[in-house]
Amino acid sequence: MNEPGMRKQTRRSFLAACSAAGVAAALPSFYVHASDKSGARAPVVGSGQHTYECIHDWLMPPEGMVWGDTHGLCQDEQGLIYVGHTVHKSSMRGEAIVVFDEKGRFVRAFGEEFRGGAHGLKLRREGKTEFLYHCDINRCKVVKTTLTGEDVWLHGYPREDANYMERPIDFVPTNVAFAPNGDFYVGDGYGSNHMLRFSLDGKFLGEIAKPGHGDAELDNPHGQWVDPRGEKPLLVVADRGNRRIQTFTLDGVHLKTIKDEAHLRMPCNFQTQGEWMVCPDLDSQVCILDREYKVAAQLGDGKAENGEVGSRRDQSRAQFTPGKFITPHDAIFLHNGDILVAEWVPIGRITLLRRT
């Protein structure tokens, strides 16, 4: 684990370290052609009340580390920002969870055990203490840790569920969501496509939905969120493989299916702040949703440039269009109302959408 005070990596030192490791040729050209000191103004995305300055690569990994796919984001009550990434194969450091302060300065890193598997990352206050919940798609576990990385518990597939008795390998959890009573929901998005419910102490309480393409059926339930904006909290599921959103009561009763591929194509996850919900869409954009889950804004929509989902993720930074997203995988509102976006691209990308 690394403590505060370690210097943040500059682009020059980053490139030098990677050259020493013999991998500079594989790096995105952003690190060579970065223009943040050139005086060039960051592009602006959105309109009206949803207008943001788009600052790509706002968070840089510490010296000796190379981002892998940047998958998960959260922020604690003190303002610290947590980034989960898979760790690039060329990285000289192996920590998969990297922590920054509100100004983007490196604080600490931990979690070498999540290398290759860091995916969903959520934070919850329980009593007076905050905890991280990690979904590890490599070890196929949900892991609860302290904010500095000490394990509280690890859970694999629910042995009480007959769906996993013959094929426990089908459990590949992608994200969690939290109910007000302490329960939490696990989306088995890369495994069985079930949505599972657990108590605060990890007891299996049953399934919310099963695989399929009809109402109350899921295909890659990639992320979920308990939405507090209405009269009663609802479980909102990013049914990514079906290119839609579904809502349920907290007990699992299906309420609504929302499909609008003209505006929302491959929802990955959610977070709410005030009356708005942010939704990273793997198909080239970040969406802002209203209380009815209608798209109020499409931010940084790069669909026209990108074409098929993921087809440009392996290209160099020089081939990325400023102000356009490639594959947004997670997004959160920061405490000040700005939005932070993590993208599923090699040698990841963390973009700050700063309110204008």
Model-identified regions with their sequence ranges:
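N-terminal secretory signal peptides
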Residues: 1-9
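N-terminal export leaders
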Residues: 10-25
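Blade/loop signatures of beta-propeller domains
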Residues: 35-54
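Beta-strand-rich domains and repeat architectures in extracellular enzymes and scaffolds
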Residues: 56-92
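Surface-exposed loop and turn segments in beta-propeller and other repeat-based domains
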Residues: 59-64, 110-114, 153-167, 205-216, ...
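Beta-rich, blade/repeat-based domains predominating
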Residues: 66-78, 114-128, 160-183, 213-234, ...
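Conserved beta-propeller blade signature
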Residues: 81-82, 131-133, 184-185, 234-236, ...
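Blade-level signature of beta-propeller repeat domains, shared across WD40, Kelch, NHL, RCC1
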Residues: 327-356
